[in-house]
Amino acid sequence: MMKNLDQNFDAILITGPTASGKSALALRLARERNGVVINADSMQVYDTLRVLTARPSDHEMEGVPHRLYGHVPAGSAYSTGEWLRDISGLLSDLRGEGRFPVIVGGTGLYFKALTGGLSDMPAIPDDLREGLRARLIEEGAAKLHAELVSRDPSMAQMLQPGDGQRIVRALEVLEATGKSIRDFQRASGPMIIDPERAQKFIVLPERPVLHDRINRRFEAMMDSGAVEEVQALLALNLAPDATAMKAIGVAQIADMLTGRMGAAEVIEKSAAATRQYAKRQMTWFRNQMGDDWTRIQP
């Protein structure tokens, strides 16, 4: 199947669950097309967490250009809309250079946005975003949720009072635009890549194979700098709800560093959490990505 790629398409899109082998496939196809590998994984954008997010190392990139990897400071929020703006500018540059984009990652929402399935969310001023995040730390999610109830009750009804990140996002949009975030969510977004002009693949290993890869990979991460990454992340004193702090393995390794968990338990619990995450990804792909996405088994 991989030998018969149509040379007339504008891009290749590759997704799949974590540890499925999609990054290796993207690398091979980019090399064949004199292309550039572009990240579509919401955790691999962060600069501090290369090992824990399985971001390709310089050695693994094998000289093929990789973009939108590790370009966001760990303490920064980074939305789907921001990724969409970043990749839009990058794709324009690559077209001018005659380079072929191979876009790969496990964040299905990014691919929906890329092909026009999501609304174009408004840009949020940094001072507004930082102010609301400071309020979240000082006042707590429940108080901000109560504010949202009074200002945007229909949106507040859709959120749990403890979901600080989404509550702050709703308030950000409300403050910046005077409109409910639901107004933007109901609108269809721009089409950055025409889905009819892209070859689209979902890499789906058999479940026992995937689980074995996950188990072995996390053990290897522990030997390859994951502990040092978490130490560096904790030294930043980020808010507990910062996206980078939610990467699988961070909480477990943090517990190990304070003596609450041993290394073997860290590996076991982190691998189990990764398997659950892969299961959620596969459910999302099954429900959200149609038959125009070719399923392949590595």
Curated annotation (Swiss-Prot):
Ranges for region Interaction with substrate tRNA: 41-44, 165-169
GO biological process, one term: tRNA modification
Keyword list, A-Z: ATP-binding, Magnesium, Nucleotide-binding, Transferase, tRNA processing, Virulence
Site (Interaction with substrate tRNA): T107, R129
Residues at which substrate binds: T18, A19, S20, G21, K22, S23
One GO MF term attached to the UniProt entry: ATP binding
Pfam families documented for this protein: IPPT
Catalytic activity: adenosine(37) in tRNA + dimethylallyl diphosphate = N(6)-dimethylallyladenosine(37) in tRNA + diphosphate
Names of required cofactors: Mg(2+)
Signal peptide residues on this chain, from the entry's feature table: none
Residues reported in the UniProt entry to bind ATP: G16, P17, T18, A19, S20, G21, K22, S23
Superkingdom classification of source: Bacteria
EC number(s) per entry: 2.5.1.75
Primary role: Catalyzes the transfer of a dimethylallyl group onto the adenine at position 37 in tRNAs that read codons beginning with uridine, leading to the formation of N6-(dimethylallyl)adenosine (i(6)A).
Protein family membership: Belongs to the IPP transferase family.
Subunit structure: Monomer.
Protein name: tRNA dimethylallyltransferase
Lineage start: Bacteria, Pseudomonadati, Pseudomonadota, Alphaproteobacteria, Hyphomicrobiales
